[in-house]
């Protein structure tokens, strides 16, 4: 206590009371402080015990956490290695995929170009197809016309074969008539030599018949064919011994000439048909070269072989060749009044 704070006492009792009261005060404060110290020491011991317990728990926890930390560190290292490996693999895979993507894009562009080219080629093929169909329809139309014409020619060939048989018979008849005329010429010559000044009425009739036959055109085949076959039947059967009249002979000769002319016309038709088949074959080859061999060439070959076979068949029937120039004509009038010269 400071000296300035000590009061001044008047008496010693006051001073003793003052110091006695002050000592009691300090004693009381000492007791209170001692009690507080004991309480503090007890609390400190309890707190120390508690702190030691907590420290042990904390150390145990630290050890556990360190173990966990080490374990996690090992896991982290392994995960880092795996991550690095996965990153490397992913980088490689991404590189490969990028290469594949670039190649795929290139292939896609090529496919787009190829598709455009295919579309253009398809358009060209469609146009060529339409042109080919048009050409094929035209060819089929021409082929049908050729088939119809061939059928018509077949019928004419059949008619020609029958006519060739008739011509051969008429040639035989003409040969017989020529021989008969030669005999009649001989007889007429003998008769003329025996009576030169008086010609017979038969010779006059013969001369007039010959002149009439020379002045008249050829008799149509359709009108005189029945007469010719009737005359041939009469000669073949020997139903009459009388000789044919000069007009009948001239009519038969005219029929033979008409038959031969018709045979020549048929030969010319066959030649024209053969030329038509050659034209069709040339057209077929042209269409095949333009459209890529779309038309089979066997049809024209068949048509050509058909015409050739018919043409050869017509040439070989009865040994008659269309180019041999076989004709029967009415010869000019001879110097003798009754002589007739026939040529086959």
UniProtKB/Swiss-Prot annotation:
<dbReference type="InterPro" id="IPR033494">
    <property type="entry name" value="NUDE"/>
</dbReference>
<keyword id="KW-0175">Coiled coil</keyword>
<dbReference type="Pfam" id="PF04880">
    <property type="entry name" value="NUDE_C"/>
</dbReference>
<dbReference type="GO" id="GO:0016477">
    <property type="term" value="P:cell migration"/>
</dbReference>
<comment type="function">
    <text>Required for organization of the cellular microtubule array and microtubule anchoring at the centrosome. Positively regulates the activity of the minus-end directed microtubule motor protein dynein. May enhance dynein-mediated microtubule sliding by targeting dynein to the microtubule plus end.</text>
</comment>
<dbReference type="GO" id="GO:0005737">
    <property type="term" value="C:cytoplasm"/>
</dbReference>
<feature type="compositionally biased region" description="Basic and acidic residues">
    <location>
        <begin position="181"/>
        <end position="190"/>
    </location>
</feature>
<dbReference type="GO" id="GO:0005813">
    <property type="term" value="C:centrosome"/>
</dbReference>
<dbReference type="GO" id="GO:0000132">
    <property type="term" value="P:establishment of mitotic spindle orientation"/>
</dbReference>
<protein>
    <recommendedName>
        <fullName>Nuclear distribution protein nudE-like 1-A</fullName>
    </recommendedName>
</protein>
<dbReference type="GO" id="GO:0008017">
    <property type="term" value="F:microtubule binding"/>
</dbReference>
<keyword id="KW-0597">Phosphoprotein</keyword>
<comment type="similarity">
    <text>Belongs to the nudE family.</text>
</comment>
<dbReference type="GO" id="GO:0051303">
    <property type="term" value="P:establishment of chromosome localization"/>
</dbReference>
<dbReference type="InterPro" id="IPR006964">
    <property type="entry name" value="NUDE_dom"/>
</dbReference>
<keyword id="KW-0493">Microtubule</keyword>
<dbReference type="GO" id="GO:0007059">
    <property type="term" value="P:chromosome segregation"/>
</dbReference>
<dbReference type="GO" id="GO:0047496">
    <property type="term" value="P:vesicle transport along microtubule"/>
</dbReference>
<dbReference type="GO" id="GO:0007020">
    <property type="term" value="P:microtubule nucleation"/>
</dbReference>
<feature type="region of interest" description="Disordered">
    <location>
        <begin position="181"/>
        <end position="209"/>
    </location>
</feature>
<dbReference type="GO" id="GO:0005819">
    <property type="term" value="C:spindle"/>
</dbReference>
<keyword id="KW-0206">Cytoskeleton</keyword>
<keyword id="KW-0813">Transport</keyword>
<dbReference type="GO" id="GO:0005871">
    <property type="term" value="C:kinesin complex"/>
</dbReference>
<keyword id="KW-0963">Cytoplasm</keyword>
<feature type="coiled-coil region">
    <location>
        <begin position="26"/>
        <end position="187"/>
    </location>
</feature>
<dbReference type="GO" id="GO:0005874">
    <property type="term" value="C:microtubule"/>
</dbReference>
<dbReference type="GO" id="GO:0007100">
    <property type="term" value="P:mitotic centrosome separation"/>
</dbReference>
<dbReference type="GO" id="GO:0000776">
    <property type="term" value="C:kinetochore"/>
</dbReference>
<dbReference type="GO" id="GO:0010975">
    <property type="term" value="P:regulation of neuron projection development"/>
</dbReference>
<feature type="region of interest" description="Disordered">
    <location>
        <begin position="322"/>
        <end position="344"/>
    </location>
</feature>
<dbReference type="GO" id="GO:0051642">
    <property type="term" value="P:centrosome localization"/>
</dbReference>
């Amino acid at each position: 206590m400071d000296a300035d704070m000590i009061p001044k006492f008047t008496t010693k009792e006051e001073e003793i009371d003052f110091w006695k009261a002050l000592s009691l005060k300090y004693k009381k404060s000492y007791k209170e402080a001692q009690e507080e110290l004991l309480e503090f020491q007890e609390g400190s011991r309890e707190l120390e015990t508690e702190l030691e317990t907590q420290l042990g728990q904390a150390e145990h926890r630290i050890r556990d956490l360190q173990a966990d930390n080490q374990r996690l560190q090992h896991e982290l290292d392994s995960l880092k290695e795996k991550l690095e490996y996965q990153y490397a693999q992913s980088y490689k895979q991404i590189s490969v995929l990028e290469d594949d993507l670039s190649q795929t894009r290139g292939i896609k562009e090529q496919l787009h170009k190829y598709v455009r080219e295919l579309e253009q080629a398809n358009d060209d093929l469609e146009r060529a197809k339409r042109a080919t169909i048009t050409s094929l329809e035209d060819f089929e139309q021409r082929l049908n016309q050729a088939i119809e014409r061939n059928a018509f020619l077949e019928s004419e060939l059949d008619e020609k074969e029958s006519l060739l048989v008739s011509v051969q018979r008429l040639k035989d008849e003409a040969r017989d008539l020529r021989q008969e005329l030669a005999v009649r010429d001989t007889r007429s010559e003998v008769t003329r030599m025996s009576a030169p000044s008086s010609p017979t009425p038969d010779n006059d009739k013969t001369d007039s018949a010959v002149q009439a036959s020379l002045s008249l055109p050829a008799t149509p085949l359709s009108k005189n064919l029945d007469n010719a076959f009737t005359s041939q039947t009469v000669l073949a059967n020997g139903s009459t011994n009388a000789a044919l009249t000069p007009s009948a002979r001239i009519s038969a000769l005219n029929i033979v000439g008409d038959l031969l002319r018709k045979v020549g016309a048929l030969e010319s038709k066959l030649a024209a048909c053969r030329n038509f088949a050659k034209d069709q074959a040339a057209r077929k080859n042209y269409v095949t070269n333009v459209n890529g061999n779309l038309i089979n060439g066997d049809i024209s070959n068949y048509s050509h072989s058909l015409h050739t076979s018919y043409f050869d068949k017509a040439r070989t029937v009865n040994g008659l060749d269309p180019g041999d120039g076989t004709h029967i004509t009415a010869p000019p009038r001879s110097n003798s009044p009754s002589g007739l010269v026939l040529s086959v």
